[in-house]
C-alpha cells in the first residue's frame, strides 16, 4: 500500500513526484509517457528559468528530474495508461490498461488533457491524410504547400509560425473576431507576408481524393460559404481533459474537468487531489500546473499525517 499514487507524466505529475519523494511519502507515479502536451511544441519561451526550450527537451528534463528521486520513496511505472480508479474505505485502487493494480491511501490526478478533434464533414476520413494535430511532428511533410491552421489560441499561432518556415502559405481560421493567443505572438505571425487570417469562420467540410485538397468554411456574419484549396490542415482547437476513467469516482464539470478547491487542489472526495490541465482551474500553463501540484502535495502531506 502506497501513501500516494500520482497519475500523469507532465509538469504537474513530475512536480508532485519530486515533492512527494522529498517529503518521504511512499509514492508511485504511473504514466503512459513523460512530457505532457508541450512535447509537440517546437520552442517554449515561458518555462521559468529557461529562456527557450523545445517541448521534447522539456519532456526529457521532467523525466530526468523524476527519475533522480526514484528509489526508496518513489516508484515509477512508465508505458501504462490508467483505465480505472476505485475509491474505498482504505484509500484508492487504480488499474492500468495492461492489467496492473496498485493501491494507496491518497491520489493525485495529473492526467492532463488531449487534443480536440475537428468536427466537420469528412474530418475523420482525412485524418492522417492531410489532417494532422501536430505541426512540429508532421509540418515538414507539407513543405512548399499551401496549408491551413484551425484555431486562434497560442497553439494555433505557434503552429502557424513553425509552418511559415517551410510552407508556401499559411491560412489561419478562427471562429471569432478575437484571439486567445498572446498579443505579441499574434502580431509577429500576422506580419509574415505568406500569412493570411480568416475570422468569424466555422469549418464545414474537408474534401480531397487520396489526400486533402480543400476546406469549406462558413462566414458566421454573412452565412456565405467559401472554399480554400490546401494540401494540409493543422487542427489546434483546444483540449479535452483526460478524465474519462474518473467519471464515476469524483465530480466533473460539464466538459469533464475535475472540480477542485483552488486553495489546495482537493476534490470533493476525501483523499483525492488533482492538478494541471485536467482540473477546472481558470488558467492552464506548464508553470501553473507545477504550482497546482506543489499546493496539492503540501495538503496531501498534512492529510496523510492526520489520517494514517
Regions found by a protein language model. Give the residues of each.
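Residue-level detector of alpha-helix initiation sites
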Residues: 10-12, 113-115, 154-155, 279-280
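Short, well-ordered coil/turn residues at beta-beta hairpins
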Residues: 8, 110-112, 117-119, 150, ...
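FAD-site-proximal beta/loop scaffold in flavoenzymes
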Residues: 114, 125-141, 237-284, 288, ...
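A Rossmann-like FAD-binding core segment of flavoenzymes
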Residues: 66-96, 101-104, 165-262, 302-308
Amino acid at each position: 500500500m502506497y501513501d500516494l499514487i500520482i497519475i500523469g507524466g507532465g509538469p504537474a505529475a513530475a512536480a508532485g513526484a519530486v515533492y512527494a519523494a522529498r517529503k518521504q511519502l511512499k509514492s508511485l507515479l504511473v504514466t503512459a509517457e513523460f512530457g505532457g502536451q508541450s512535447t509537440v511544441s517546437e520552442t517554449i519561451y515561458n518555462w521559468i528559468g529557461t529562456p527557450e526550450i523545445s517541448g521534447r527537451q522539456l519532456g526529457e528534463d521532467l523525466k530526468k528530474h523524476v527519475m533522480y528521486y526514484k528509489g526508496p520513496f518513489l516508484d515509477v511505472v512508465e508505458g501504462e495508461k490508467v483505465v480505472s480508479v476505485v475509491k474505498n474505505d482504505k484509500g484508492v485502487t487504480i488499474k492500468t490498461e495492461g492489467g496492473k493494480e496498485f493501491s494507496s491511501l491518497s491520489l493525485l490526478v495529473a492526467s492532463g488533457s488531449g487534443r480536440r478533434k475537428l468536427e466537420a464533414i469528412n474530418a475523420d476520413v482525412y485524418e492522417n491524410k492531410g489532417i494532422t494535430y501536430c505541426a512540429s511532428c508532421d509540418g515538414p511533410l507539407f513543405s512548399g504547400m499551401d496549408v491551413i491552421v484551425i484555431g486562434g489560441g497560442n497553439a494555433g499561432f505557434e503552429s502557424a509560425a513553425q509552418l511559415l518556415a517551410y510552407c508556401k502559405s499559411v491560412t489561419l481560421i478562427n471562429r471569432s473576431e478575437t484571439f486567445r493567443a498572446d498579443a505579441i505572438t499574434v502580431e509577429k505571425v500576422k506580419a509574415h507576408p505568406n500569412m493570411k487570417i480568416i475570422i468569424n469562420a466555422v469549418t464545414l467540410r474537408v474534401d480531397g481524393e487520396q489526400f486533402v485538397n480543400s476546406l469549406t468554411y462558413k462566414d458566421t456574419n454573412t452565412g456565405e460559404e467559401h472554399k480554400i484549396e490546401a494540401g494540409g490542415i493543422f487542427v489546434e482547437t483546444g483540449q479535452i481533459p483526460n478524465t474519462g476513467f474518473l467519471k464515476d469516482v469524483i465530480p466533473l464539470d460539464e466538459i469533464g474537468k475535475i472540480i477542485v478547491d483552488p486553495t489546495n487542489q482537493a476534490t470533493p472526495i476525501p483523499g483525492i487531489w488533482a492538478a494541471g490541465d485536467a482540473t477546472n482551474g481558470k488558467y492552464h500553463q506548464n508553470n501553473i500546473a507545477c504550482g497546482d501540484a506543489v499546493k496539492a502535495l503540501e495538503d496531501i502531506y498534512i492529510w496523510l499525517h492526520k489520517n494514517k
